[in-house]
Amino acid sequence: MGVIKAQSVLKVERIVVGTAVEERLPVGESDTFADSVGTLFCYTEIRGTGDSTTVSHVWYHGEIRRADVKLNVRGYRWRTWSTKVIQEDWTGEWRVDIVSVDGKILKSKRFRIIDTDGNEVAVDTTSN
């Protein structure tokens, strides 16, 4: 009689957007960043697979996809992150979707970029 292996299910335990990752932990976590931030990090903790797979961090500014970063997941508990350079005129609403290899959105994180005066600048984020 063979052993039946239960199918692994990926679960995003934690998703953070911040200004750095130091010693494999996020730094500068917030939901609002100044347009002068430069680079942001999306940090995720993923559980549920003992097998090697990938997830993607898909960065959106409004409805414009700004980046799609594929990341390896190689253990039951895995920490990984991606980075995105933020241009100063990219103010407004943002989100990062964590997407499985089969295209399922596992979790999303929303945040906002504001101008250095604390005001939002009107930017058309519906088209390229």
Where are these regions (language model features)?
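Short edge beta-strand/loop segments characteristic of extracellular beta-sandwich folds
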Residues: L40-R47
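Aromatic sugar-binding surface patches on proteins
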Residues: R74-T83
